[in-house]
């Protein structure tokens, strides 16, 4: 991986879950795990973010919210689905209002399975997302060759 030209910013959104993965995402920001050592910064504004980290599954109420946030993030952007609920719907999959994983409504680049996903796995997924982000940035600088982007990498 080449050196980053600027620090990537992540935006975390909890769709609908037990909040176990949210606690683990927040643990990544503490001094014990210190995700900022990779140059990653947390933001609350989608217009400033590069990496969209989603925990929890999609339900009828948050479907449009997730799409709206995704559309506000400038290109190139990377989506990381954290936890089994975000990847497939998890234990709530059979509930009447759960549609499934995040990939039902927006494209996902990195999947971090687990219930709850461990901070080490989340950091590994975000570091993989950094590589994908740099690839997407490089492709945006080059003329279109007609090749499709590969995604859906599992950590």
Predicted regions and their residues:
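Iron-sulfur-associated redox domains of electron-transfer enzymes in respiratory
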Residues: 1-155
